[in-house]
Amino acid sequence: VYSSCQKSKAQKSVYPNHVGDTAFDEKIDDPNFKVCTTGRIPQYYEFGKSLQFKGEKPAIDKHFEILKQNESTAESGYITIRFIVNCEGKTGRYRIEEMNNDYQPMSFDKKLVEKILTLTKELSGWIVGGNTEQPVDYYQYLTFKIEGGKLIEIMP
């Protein structure tokens, strides 16, 4: 029986710490946006609260009201924008997922997606996660239900 006493070098993982972690991407992310939490960033619903926004869902619905008058198109499905709210209530690391009504990947009109992303980035009023003694970053998402090119509903 042979055994080796050589120590193997620790390999650096190419995977995020947790499924769904959004790593900084210098091509698309704002370098001035900083996360405060080291390690795992929780999801918004892990605080046992609903949507963490001043004015809650009615304020978000009002902000996106303009999309209900959008031009009619044949496009229907869902556009989800996921992002991080940091311990200062600032947002960054936006990611977009587009899918049809059967939850299969698709691409919506770029102008519509850009308009939704811009309006999402303009939202101010995100409530800091955690508590006053120890604020934390968290992941938030907004899913936009689109029918015929028009906004029907925003979830959560």
Feature locations, PLM:
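Charge-biased low-complexity segments
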Residues: 6-156
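C-terminal motif of bacterial Sec signal peptides marking the signal peptidase cleavage site
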Residues: 2-4
